[in-house]
Amino acid sequence: MTKVVPIRDHHVDLLALYEAGLELYHSGGLPKGETTGWPGVDEFYTVGRGQWTVVTGIPGSGKSEWLDALMVNLAEADPAWLFCLYSPENFPTVGHLVKLVEKRVRKPFNRGPTDRMSTSEYASGAAWVLEHFLWLETDLKSPEALLDAALSYRGDPNRKLGVVLDPWNTLEHQRGGMNETDYVSLVLTGVTHLARETGAHVWLVVHPAKILRNRDGTRPVPTPYDLSGSAHWYNKADNIITVHRDQVEGQDVEIHVQKVRFKNLGRVGLAMLKYDRVVGRYFEMKHYVEGELYADPERR
């Protein structure tokens, strides 16, 4: 005979919930996330723990480069950050290390017209990078295996864990008998649960489907509904960011924040950054656009 369990055994402790809300009230309200290092981007997106973010953009837009710069900014602001990276397109791995060192040292690694980092600067920069970044083995191919491996590093309560899978499209997806839409929905639900349970922040880099050029030859900004696989990307993700730039005209970079689930962490809108190609860093441009740009989430 099935045991009847009183409903009161399953609800949240209401007194504890009330007291937690009161504590937040007296502290000023729900907190923002951690700064990206760019005040203009912080207007629209801050990094909350226990969440996940989609980063997308057309090929060559710099989405991986921007994400690297974001992680360096986070670790410089708070040394507790540890990032687990799966980034097979950043090959060889030593090249990815060098790019992160350049961002840390603010000098180029290679010989050239710009003042190059010294061997001691490389040594200190590399030591810093290796304190905050580790690379997952590329023989782990499925999103489930990679997330499990990354989350095995969450044991130290004094560290903040960030996980990057870049890009999603290169992973091996074992769908079994499921269609792609159902598979994407299932895996992304798992990403949400893992982030919530562990307090990690997960970034998934996702290539959009092929996007046709405008009549003037420019390429439109990809939207969440252009992502390869499923509209579940928009429904499931906590945050969606598109990195976009004109690859011919210059180094102005558009950071399109197209979804933010929790209003204390940000809002939709557009911030502009300037890209320094020599060391791979991004700098503020005092030009921000309010969120009406994305008033209709169904726009294409």
Where are these predicted regions, by residue range?
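Flexible beta-alpha connector loops of hexameric P-loop NTPases
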Residues: R111-T114, W135-E137, E172-S185, R215-Y225
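Structural recognition of the conserved hydrophobic beta-strand(s) that form the central parallel beta-sheet
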Residues: L85, V164-L165, A200-H207
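Cytosolic-facing regulatory segments adjacent to core modules
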Residues: W38-E43, A77-R159, H173, L270-A271
